[in-house]
């Protein structure tokens, strides 16, 4: 199974999709020193506006242009998403934090963070980002930093960050939302769809005999299920 991490939020970040980066007036187009990203999405209309159950039909395509700032700065929405995804990532790490005690030159020391063992060494990346390593024989004790209750709280918090990040796309695509802008929502799904096709093409190119049996572009998960053919 191949799965993009936070596909729609990541799409909005990578293409800088935001209300303040969407070029809607000609005077903001082709400015010197700026680059632009064009995204083409499908346009649909109701088959029968009075009977919504009949569904929609594709009537064309529209190309939207988004500015890419020369200093690498992101638009408002991508900045918010970056903060949410970063917070989620750091929160998820805390769930598996360990607290270790070890001896060094007769002195007992204690650190908490991401723990691993490699080549006879105990290695821990502390909360502050410092890398500490010591011989495994100097290890006195190791325990989970957080209790089971605290882990459940942290898990709920990381899930809240994830849902909030995903819901920003939903709000932009909802007519009742104050931040509704259909072209941004459509450009997001178009980017996500392109990434799924890219993953499919690269997989088939890399793994001889692989077959795509399912692809899901519904949030929050976007897996590609693969089957390897047996000759």
What is the role of each PLM region?
Residues 1-231:
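Conserved acidic
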